[in-house]
Each structure stands twice: as structure tokens, then as C-alpha cells.
Amino acid sequence: MDITQLLAFSTKNKASDLHLSAGLPPMIRVHGDIRRINVEALDHKQVHAMIYDIMNDAQRKHYEEFLEVDFSFEIEGLARFRVNAFNQNRGAAAAFRTIPSKILTLEQLNCPPIFAELALKPRGLVLVTGPTGSGKSTTLAAMVDHLNERSYGHVLTIEDPIEFVHESKKCLVNQREVGRMTLSFASALRSALREDPDAILVGEMRDLETIRLAMTAAETGHLVFGTLHTSSAAKTIDRIVDVFPSEEKDMVRAMLSESLVAVISQTLCKNKEGSGRIAAHEIMLGTPAVRNLIRENKVAQMYSAIQMGNGFGMQTLDQSLTDLVRRNQISNAEARSKSKIPENFPG
């Protein structure tokens, strides 16, 4: 099988990822589980040739120099794929993440109604967080698409690499890829403020300068969507503040308390039939009470504020899991495995 056939097989079997690793057969991840494809093991030369075939010259040069590279590419009529090519102890390797060619709607993703409201906010910082593979990009793509269909504005995305491709509908959408169309998230964000955007998507807020610029953009009247690899709203606030030196922390808390609109922390759960996965969400909104907790560094009290904030559209992860169990969408055992307080789901 060549790389196109392997990716077609992967997509047909609803796999989220395809893994190539010298010395082993290709493997796919289906509903969270890794499974081997029933073909012979690939050697280093085969894997190397497969990934070289889909790289451009700049990507090959980067791979040779740094021994790993991130990029995305599309197979017409099949899907887009986000690729990380690297080396391991048996030779060449690569991980391919499937990016559906069609952007799912917030309704198709079973997102709570508050997501649609957040996508249309005029300004502020909306963060979608969670571990790798938790569907952050899919959720953000749906939110941007919701905005694109309902508002006349300029949406600017900064990604590494570009994942979902947005057509300009009611909005003008410009997508920039780090490494190909801009040197870094920070340099693209600095330029963004002179490019007349209404909304900015920052694919990953991974360093101090990017976080500072994203908060500044939100503070100066832009809607900013961003992602972090944190597992809860409280940890997200801590992570942002901890990036800054001690003498700036109070100022950052003040900035964050003014600009934060929402933190959505999500995790994917296997559905009851075992035929797919569904997201559970912790949702924290920038209510006056939450803003005050951020300003006064009372992060430990955020869980209680979220618990009590149902009327505003807030929910804890356990409240989301309980709702999914009640609606018979996930099992009690699955909820227990994802919960931060497993004893809430006895059995």
C-alpha cells in the first residue's frame, strides 16, 4: 500500500490518526484505541519514501536539519491531514491526524448553546483547552464557522500548520501558517493588530510573548480564540499567570480579569455504542464573580463558582459527564474514568 491508499483506508475506517513507524506495520487510532493494519511491517526506507513524497522542498530541508517537521497537506476528495514526521530508534516515523474536509457545526458536535453565543462576542479572550487529541481544533473551527456564517467581519487565523480551511462566507477569512506565511505566532500577532481583524484565532498560545500579545489584542477590542494544553479552567488561569515573571503577575491577573470571556476545557469520551466519541466540557465564563477571583488570585475557589454558575451557562466537567450519562450517551464507567472526582460515579 502506498501513502494515499493507507490514508484512504484510515479515513474509511473513521480513524483519527494514522501512524507509520519503521520496523512495524502501519497503525490507526479508532475511537481512541491504536489498532494494527493487517499488512507487513514497513522498513526505514519505505517510511522515509512515503513521508518524503508528500513534503515540499522546504519541509524536506527542515526535516533533514531538525530531524522532525510539522506540516499539513490535502488529498483531493478525501481529507486534509496534519503531519508530524520524526525519527525514532528503528528509523523514520510519522503521525497523520485526519482533518475532515467538512467543518462540523456546533449542533453536530453537540456543543452547549453557550458556544454559539461566545462565537459572536464582539471582543475578549475565548480559550478552548484540553490534552492533545481532545478535539480543540474541531470545536474552534465550528465556532469560527458559526461566526463566518452570521457576521460581517475580518477573521484572521494563525496556525501551525493550517488545519481546517475556511471559505470566506459573510466574513473575510485570512489564514496564516507559521513557518510558511509568517515566522512565528508572536510576529503574526504583532502584525495582526495592523491588519484590521475583528476576530483572531491563535492556534497555540505556547510562549510568554504570544500570550501577552493575545491578551493585548483581546483588551484592545478584538475577539481572540486561543488554545492551551490545560485540563481545567483553574489550571488554565494558573498556566497563563505562571508564564510571566513574578513582578508582572498582578498586572497579568488584572489584564486577564478584564479580557477573559470564557475558558472551555474539554475531553473526549467513548460513546455507549462504542461507535465514536463525544466531548464533555467544563465551561467557565468571565462573570463578575470569576473576574474578581482571577484578580484576587483565588483560583482554588473557581470550581465552586463554576458549580454555582449554571444559570449563566457554566458547568463543571462532572456536571457535563453526569448529563451525558443521564442522556444515555456514555456509560457510568466511562464517566468515572474521565472524572476528576471518580467517586461521583460509583459502580
Task: Put a short name on every predicted segment.
Residues M1-G347:
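Short, flexible helix-loop junctions that flank or precede catalytic/ligand sites
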